[in-house]
Regions:
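A short small-residue
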Residues: 59-63, 314-316
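A short acidic, helix-capping loop that chelates divalent metal ions and anchors anionic groups
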Residues: 63-69
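Flavin (primarily FAD) cofactor-binding/catalytic cores of flavoenzymes
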Residues: 2-10, 15-34, 38-40, 69-171, ...
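Redox-cofactor-proximal catalytic regions of oxidoreductases
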Residues: 36-44, 48-61
Length: 349
């Protein structure tokens, strides 16, 4: 059987696109590598909370139910995704890992660990979680302490009493540092000076700023003063860490030894490293399509510039402003579904 549309991934981008496709009369099949609902949120650390209230953290059509606190927790997001799937009765097969996608004439052949699937259109919505990025430093291969990427960090328990280097800024770096510093001696290394949003601002402000940038770009204009996008959001845990005086940036890393990080002026004993250095887009599951390596030219909006019938959504700025966020991906999912529906109408005619 050849499906009209197959969506790869059942995170926020995949579910949002499925919702809008169903509104356009198309019932897509979703292939999800995870064993259950939740997308990348299944892999987030235990204490993670969104920094926007549920009104700014909901998928289209169904508001997130009331949460225990102002900002939804990781577990509440996972539970909400499950309710969303049930509400709209999406067809989802899991766990199914996509190994490759090829195209023969006008049909996509999707090779998985559970057989082959065929589709006339494919939406890749796998996110960036599998592309964990760790930078290189002189001597890093000599370091013999524990290392974990933020994608694999769960809680602070195993770091009790240790000297821990948190490498990387952003919201993951600040929040993990805040948690680990409660029971460990932490050192924070970032590649630029630390900068924070005002205490009263949260994700709502960033969404509104992103929306302004989106509409400015639609008009061919450029929104000035976008530095706030890179600033750290002052959630309660980070405010508390500030009060304890642990939000201190160390000197730049020059090299590593077996047990130390070496800077220009000191050697710092380190037992463990937590890498909060983000993710790189990983599209190995599409290798058979031989996509461009330049992400900026890979899509026009979310539509592939190389293959008709292929869309990529939710990977970050190159696939749409704020498209890696729950609320930000909605407008891109709506447009993606519209384009797909339109393509089938054109084929039918």
């Amino acid at each position: 059987m050849t499906e009209q549309v197959i969506i790869i991934g059942a995170g926020q981008a995949g579910l949002s696109t499925a919702y809008y496709l169903k509104r356009n009369g198309i019932d897509p099949l979703i292939l999800d590598a995870n064993p259950t609902h939740g997308g990348a949120w299944l892999h987030a650390w235990d204490s993670l909370r969104l920094f926007s209230p549920k009104e700014y953290s909901s998928l289209s059509g169904f508001m997130m139910p009331k949460t225990r606190e102002a900002y939804p927790s990781r577990d509440e997001v996972i539970d909400y995704f499950g309710k969303y799937e049930q509400r709209y009765q999406f067809r989802i097969e899991r766990p199914v890992k996509v190994l490759d996608v090829t195209k023969v004439e006008d049909t996509f052949h999707i090779t998985t660990d559970n057989g082959e699937f065929l589709a006339k259109a494919v939406v890749s919505a796998t996110g960036n979680f599998s592309g964990q990025f760790i930078p290189t430093f002189p001597g890093l291969e000599r370091f013999i302490g524990d290392q974990v990427h933020s994608a694999d960090y769960k809680n602070n328990t195993i770091f009790s009493g240790k000297n821990v280097a948190v490498i990387g800024s952003g919201n993951s770096g600040s929040q993990i540092l805040a948690e680990v510093s409660q029971i460990a001696n932490t050192h924070w290394f970032t590649n630029h000076p630390l900068d924070y949003l005002d205490d009263e601002l949260d994700g709502r402000y960033l969404f509104e700023l992103s929306t302004k940038r989106y509409y400015a770009a639609m008009k061919g204009e450029k929104l000035e003063n976008t530095d706030d996008f890179s600033k750290i959001v002052m959630v309660d845990s980070v405010k508390e860490a500030r009060e304890r005086g642990v939000l201190i940036r160390e000197e730049d890393i020059e090299s590593f030894s077996e047990h130390e990080i070496i800077t220009a002026n000191k050697r710092i004993a380190i037992d463990a490293i937590i890498w909060c250095t983000g993710f790189k887009t990983q599209l190995n599951h599409l290798k058979g399509l031989q996509l461009n390596t330049d992400l900026q030219s890979l899509t026009q909006g979310t539509r592939s510039t190389q293959h008709s019938g292929l869309w990529l959504i939710g990977y970050g700025e190159w696939s749409g402003y704020a498209s890696a966020t729950i609320i930000g991906v909605q407008k891109h999912a709506r447009e993606t579904a519209r384009q797909i529906a339109e393509s089938f109408e054109l084929i039918a005619s």
